[in-house]
């Protein structure tokens, strides 16, 4: 993990209130090299659903993934818990215990996040897992009416 030298790490402008060192380092690298991180396996990964199903199978099934995820959660290993459960939820979106534990995991990660955007993504992800995605499936009638009145130019 990359860390700033202690001589500048605690300066207000260098704190992770918006961006984070880990993201900024990646952004600097990507500015020169694009999205690719240099790992060949990341060139053409499986789609999340297919990858999730294969991970769940490789780990030994849904019950085994849940067992390992609960152990990791109880040990405070929230990033590993999120990784395990993310695969399970993509493999089986209707698995309620996995969705609930993943929501709890995202909440813990959100509470610990110094970065505002990270906190927002974690807590919004937790809410979406338990309450659904806001506005999904609802037509916006104003937008439809507006688009009918726009010219193609």
Map each language-model feature to its residues.
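Accessory terminal helices/loops
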Residues: 1-152
């Amino acid at each position: 993990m990359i860390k700033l030298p202690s001589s500048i790490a605690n300066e207000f402008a260098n704190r992770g209130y918006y961006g984070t060192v880990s993201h900024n380092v990646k952004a600097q690298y990507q500015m020169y090299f694009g999205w690719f991180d240099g790992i060949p396996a990341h060139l053409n990964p499986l789609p999340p659903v297919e990858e999730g199903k294969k991970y769940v199978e490789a780990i030994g099934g849904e019950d085994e993934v849940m067992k390992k995820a609960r152990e990791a959660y109880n040990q405070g290993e929230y990033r590993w818990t999120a990784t395990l459960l993310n695969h399970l939820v993509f493999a089986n979106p209707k698995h309620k215990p996995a969705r609930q534990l993943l929501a709890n995991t995202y909440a813990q990660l959100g509470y610990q996040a110094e970065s505002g955007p990270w906190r927002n993504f974690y807590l919004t992800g937790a809410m979406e897992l338990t309450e659904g995605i806001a506005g999904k499936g609802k037509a916006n009638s104003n937008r439809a009416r507006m688009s009918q009145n726009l010219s193609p130019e």
